[in-house]
UniProtKB/Swiss-Prot annotation:
It holds the Pfam family Arm. It is found in: Nucleus; Cell junction, Desmosome; Cell junction; Cytoplasm. GO terms for molecular function: cadherin binding. GO terms for cellular component: adherens junction; cytoplasm; desmosome; intercalated disc; nucleus; plasma membrane. Gene3D superfamilies: Leucine-rich Repeat Variant. This is Plakophilin-2. Disruption phenotype: Morpholino knockdown results in a range of cardiac phenotype severity from mild to severely affected. Defects include slight to severe cardiac edema, blood pooling on the yolk, abnormal ventricles, heartstring and failure of cardiac looping. Heart rate is decreased at 48 hours post-fertilization (48 hpf) from 138 beats per minute (bpm) to 110 (bpm), this decrease persists at 72 hpf. Non-cardiac effects include kinked tail and disruption to the borders of anterior neural structures. Required for development of the heart, potentially via cell-cell adhesion and modulation of expression of cardiac precursor genes. Plays a role in desmosome cell-cell junctions and their intracellular connectivity. The gene is pkp2. Residues 1-12 have a biased composition (Basic and acidic residues).
Length: 815
């Protein structure tokens, strides 16, 4: 019987993901997240101030053709708006025709606009200048080249300025706004006055072009430019004054924002959602070593590169402009308790996260400095940014460090984590929380505790909304759906499913867990995505939950019905060994008995899904279409577990696989092409199926040649796993015990020389396991007396079948 499927190993979290990164829906962004079209100036720091940012002096001369086009557009807009205005009942404007004459010189200062209007003098309403405040958009169609503006790129390895922000990205100047490429959540023009980042030192560049405005004007567009020398002189004077002011501010309060781009915090890095980054750590089938979710790990886990030697600095004592010496872990842990400075706490948590990335010494220091309880306290803060920073740091701290995992448990950290997972709605934070739980679940001493406490919250908070099983029922739950969160949660449950009988019982009894997992797998098959990254975890969960299900699951209504067996038909055995079976032989009489058939239940509930016909078909589909080695192995292993028990359910499933679904055709392909591990599981499944005599004809007809071909030759140097050889010998024993015709089929496939060769193998203390199984098989073959003459004709003697080695092996097997 197959052991439970192994669990995933842990993975650390640097600034990126499976610590998880995805951009939350822009529709959820608050008003402060939206972009303004202009920048604040030296003395205007009001939240709603969006005054005009004027261009540089050397950019004031624009092309005549472009200027004429802009003015003509404005005039046409004015005329069209005036024509659309309603006419009063008692007085109306006459049909007015306006003609525009535009003359221009080489300078914008001599630009003139002449208008002639024909107006009904009885009208009491006077025409006014264009009211730009009523334009459909406050933004110009295109910013002219030379206009400096902040642009925060979402691809910069730093913190974006949303509600989940932690550090500032680099802010290069751009020639114009690229509105189709700039997500609103990442764009802010009022960043320099945002008090949330007063204590942070980030890699930010001040635009090279100074920004200035006229505080007395209400202009929001750049259409009307100064047209006289007096106005241009006044503008030059204001520009010079503003340059001096900004230079002073840069020497003071803003200097902390001008670090090199090479200085970066190990903070969140947004990544594309759903498309899985190639290369993950395998499930290590056959090993009981846990696997933890590791973000940014080296090797086969998905990873985004980060700068490991980035110099991280903090402002000291809250004084703007002062940079402290290089931060130490002790200082960072102490800063976690500064409740009056949230930005400093976030920065300290990010520094700890950075240091603990691939640094075992840093993790040990955090334990001795009592940093874990302080981070757990920060997780209870109302700030999402602080929660994210604390969870991300804790995730790295516990990676591959069992002492830190136990410290989280001893500090009552698990209730804090699960409570935050239940109430938090931020996708980034939920990714970190599920990744943290995955890492914690890899410690064997925590699995039982986590099985009791975490299975139900993970099912309700993650599996239900992310699997799609509740789609259309609750729109709020759909907002929580995220593939990385689901992947982390199923990784945690995969570990917990190998905790033992008690853990398996909790998971089987958890309402909705099995339904969600199966619903998700069936969805990926229907969408032609059987190699989805979370599907492997889901199949491994079911693999472990199916282990010894017949013994561990309370008796329920049997899902089988008695079905009369069809008349047994002998398989043709072309070759030198031919035998005729009497009509009233024991094997034919036995073939007339009834056998259990798996009922087609369209709506299983809970644990019934484990042995449902729908689920069995699902596993066969995965075997056929999946290219993920571990998904395929887990699918075969689950069928092996389901057919391994001695009850009616296992017998019914075996008949369903062979006779109803034609599953042996898939097994045959595995025997021909599979790797060693898949081959081992496949022959184990066939061994379970070979226990039922009514299925022997199908086995002999479809897969016997492949089984014999796998047996090692005496002259073949290829190393054959001994377990595979032993299992094939047991299959042949089951076949030969039931029927002399099966024995003829085995010999006609050329198996006898191989079996005799295997039986002679010795390890120095006696026959090997494979040798013992081959000896029992030879003894079984000789029991068919009607074949003795055929054996002699083929050149074999009785001593080839019955000798001291075979007799000793048979006696040992009986004991």
């Amino acid at each position: 019987m197959l052991k439970p499927h192994p669990e995933h190993k842990e993975q650390p979290q640097d600034s990126f993901t499976p610590s998880g990164d995805s951009t939350p829906d822009a529709s959820m962004a608050e008003e402060r997240d939206f972009m303004r079209s202009v920048l604040p100036v030296y003395d205007s720091f009001h939240p709603e101030d969006s005054s005009l940012a004027l261009p540089l002096a050397n950019k004031l001369t624009l092309a005549d053709a472009h200027r004429l086009n802009r003015l003509q557009q404005q005039v046409q807009l004015t005329l069209s708006r005036k024509k659309r205005k309603p006419k009063p009942a008692d007085s109306s404007l006459a049909e007015s025709q306006s003609s525009c004459q535009i003359s221009s010189s080489s300078s914008l200062g001599s630009l003139h606009l002449k208008r002639t209007f024909s107006v009904n003098h009885e009208a009491t309403r006077s025409l006014r200048m264009v009211d730009r405040s009523q334009w459909p958009s406050m933004e110009p169609p295109l910013f002219h080249r030379g206009y400096g503006s902040f642009r925060y790129t979402p691809k910069r390895a730093g913190l974006c300025l949303g509600s989940n922000s932690l550090t500032l990205p680099s802010a290069p100047t751009t020639s114009h706004f690229q509105m189709n490429k700039l997500p609103l959540r990442y764009a802010h023009s009022e960043v320099l006055r945002n008090p949330r980042f007063a204590g942070l030192s980030a890699a930010t560049q001040i635009p090279s072009s100074p920004v200035y405005e006229n505080p007395h004007t209400d202009d929001t567009d750049d259409v009307f430019l100064p047209s006289t020398s007096v106005e241009r002189g006044r503008m030059e004077s204001e520009k010079h004054t503003l340059q001096q002011t900004l230079c002073k501010q840069r020497e003071g309060g803003f200097v902390a924002l001008e670090q090199s781009e090479n200085v970066s915090w190990q903070s969140r890095v947004r990544k594309p959602s759903l498309e899985f980054v190639a290369g993950r750590r395998p499930s290590q089938t056959g090993s009981l070593i846990s696997m933890e979710e590791q973000s940014g790990s080296l090797g086969r886990i998905e990873k985004l590169e980060v700068k490991q030697h980035a110099v991280t600095t903090l402002t000291k004592k809250g004084k703007p402009g002062e940079l402290s010496a290089e931060m130490t872990l002790k200082e960072a842990v102490n800063l976690l308790t500064q409740d009056n400075n949230m930005e400093t706490q976030i920065a300290a948590a990010n520094f700890i996260q950075n240091q603990c990335f691939n640094s075992p010494d840093a993790k040990r220091k955090i334990l001795h400095l009592q940093g874990i309880p302080k981070l757990l306290k920060l997780m209870q803060n109302d700030s999402e940014e602080l929660q994210w920073a604390a969870v991300s740091s804790l995730r790295n701290i516990v990676f591959e460090n069992n002492e830190n995992k136990m410290e989280v448990k001893d500090c009552e950290g698990l209730p804090v984590i699960l409570r935050l997972l239940k109430i938090n709605r931020d996708i980034e934070t939920r990714r970190q929380l599920t990744g943290l739980l995955w890492n914690l679940s890899s410690h064997d001493l925590l699995k039982e505790h986590l099985s009791r406490e975490a299975v139900k919250p993970l099912t309700d908070s993650v599996l239900v909304p992310c699997s799609g099983i509740s789609e259309g029922e609750d729109p709020k739950l759909e907002l929580l759906a995220d593939p990385d969160i689901f992947y982390n949660a199923t990784g945690c449950l995969r570990n917990l499913s190998s905790a033992g009988p008690d853990g398996r019982k909790v998971m089987r009894d958890c309402e909705g867990l099995i339904e969600c997992v199966i619903y998700y797998i069936r969805g990926t098959i229907a969408d032609y995505k059987p190699d989805d990254k979370a599907t492997e975890n889901c199949v491994c969960i079911l693999h472990n939950l199916s282990y010894r299900f017949d013994c561990e699951v309370p008796r329920v209504d049997s899902p089988v019905a008695q079905k009369p067996k069809q008349t047994h038909t002998e398989t043709s055995n072309p070759g030198c060994f031919i035998i005729k079976t009497p009509k009233n032989s024991a094997e034919n009489l036995e073939a007339d008995e009834d056998y259990p058939a798996l009922e087609e239940n369209g709506s299983p509930h809970g644990v019934e899904w484990l042995w449902s016909a729908i689920t069995v078909r699902m596993y066969l589909s995965l075997i056929a279409v999946s290219t993920n080695q571990h998904t395929k192995q887990a699918s075969i292993g689950t069928l092996q577990n389901l057919t391994a028990c001695s009850g009616e359910i296992s017998q019914a499933i075996a008949h369903f696989i062979v006779q109803k679904e034609g599953g042996l055709s898939q097994v045959k392909k595995l025997l021909q092409e599979a790797e060693k591990e898949e081959l081992r599981i496949s022959v184990s499944l066939l061994k379970n199926i070979s226990r039922y005599r009514e299925l022997h004809a199908d086995i002999v007809k479809q897969v016997l040649p492949e089984l014999v071909a796998i047996l090692p030759n005496s002259d073949r140097n290829v190393e054959q796993p001994i377990e595979i050889t032993v299992t094939i010998c047991h299959i042949l024993i089951n076949l030969s015990q039931a029927s002399a015709s099966n024995t003829c089929a085995i010999i006609n496939q050329g198996a006898l020389p191989k079996i005799i060769s295997i039986s002679s193998k010795d390890n120095g203390f006696g026959p090997t396991r494979a040798g013992q199984a081959a000896c029992v098989l030879l003894h079984t073959l000789w029991r068919h007396s009607e074949l003795h003459s055929s054996f002699k004709k083929a050149g074999y003697r009785k001593t080839d079948f019955i000798n001291n080695r075979t007799v000793k092996a048979v006696n040992s097997a009986r004991e």
